[in-house]
Amino acid sequence: MRQFVVIGHDVPTDPDAISLSDIPGAGRLDLLCRCVAAGVFLSHGIRERVRVHLVVADEFTVTFDADSLRHLHPDERNVAARIRDALDAQDDAIGHMPADVSPGVELRRMGLEATLDRVLDTPGTSSASADPTLVQLHEDGDPLVDAAPPTDPVFVLSDHNDFAPAERDLLADRAERRVRVGPELLHADHTVSVVHNWLDTDGYESY
């Protein structure tokens, strides 16, 4: 399984503060929507065995599970509406029990650290790997092309902001690798696409 944990620092937790007419104005929610689309969609379908976790204001995590998604479209407005619905269900997220928003979409009352604990404590889905591998995507990391693709990776990346000091400390302690996808800085959603391509083409010699 491939998993992406995207940190949204400025997205409001109040669903009433999210306007579908001004998605970027909701703490650059548009960027998180594009990360979801890049994470779960193919040209004419949905990927298998992919999850995207959006950490909102280090308070809630909205999870999109590609294997269970229904009636989700790749446009920003559709994804933003699903995120807003998730935040609207926050009263149903009690403790670490999720609120079921729609097929394939859940909201948990968890920040980054608790989300990483939960994701990393879930055994990998490949017989070749017992545990997921946490990989931080960062401009100061090692070149992606020099790294061997992990079997059950969990990639952590930030939105348009850099990682906060506490996030950097947490990832320095928990991440097994820190990699950079290329020589130029990319938007978070483009980074997700590059990582997918890296994993998709591993072992391919011809197309």
Swiss-Prot record:
Organism: Halorubrum lacusprofundi (strain ATCC 49239 / DSM 5036 / JCM 8891 / ACAM 34)
Gene giving rise to this polypeptide: trmY
Metal-binding keyword on record: no
InterPro entries according to UniProt: Alpha/beta_knot_MTases, TrmY, tRNA_m1G_MTases_N
Name assigned to this protein: tRNA (pseudouridine(54)-N(1))-methyltransferase
Lineage: superkingdom: Archaea
Subcellular localization, as worded in the UniProt entry: Cytoplasm
GO molecular function terms noted in the UniProt entry: S-adenosylmethionine-dependent methyltransferase activity; tRNA methyltransferase activity
HAMAP family associated with the record: tRNA_methyltr_TrmY
Protein family per UniProt: Belongs to the methyltransferase superfamily. TrmY family.
EC class: transferase
